[in-house]
Amino acid sequence: MDTLKPSDLTTELLNTGQSGVPLVICSEAPRVRKRIESAGYQEVKINKELSKRLLDIPKEDRPKLVEKALKGMLNYHVPIFVTDFEMLFDPRYEIDVLRFFCEKARIINVAIKWPGQFTDGKLTYATPEDPDYHEFDCNAYQIRIVQ
């Protein structure tokens, strides 16, 4: 895991590739989004489109087919900036969200807007009492945190 400041996030860095390492955006700085957009990243909002795709699948089959549907959705050949993906934390789906985006970053440049917190080398989503709660030890993943 590397940690970058928003000022480290240059257009050159974004355009030359991340060597298969996704950027995990934990910063709310407006310039981060502007730099990602100016580097040609396509914003992909997951929740609404994935929900539509899953409606065609019987409820009992969704957990085992959600990752396949997600891969079909993300069949891009340009860098992507992933937002609105909270539904991936649903415990029924059993998706390792960071692993999934690390695999995608081997094919194209990936930046994701983290919907939770980054503290003490850990990314979290929700609070421990929530059923959707997830905690990721960032040292277990090849990622770059922008905070």
Regions found by a protein language model. Name each.
Residues 20-24, 76-82, 108-112:
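Generic beta-sheet signal
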Residues 45-50, 84-85, 114-116:
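Short loop/turn segments at strand-loop or loop-helix junctions that form parts
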Residues 1-73, 122-130, 134, 142-147:
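Extended, compositionally biased accessory segments flanking or bridging domains
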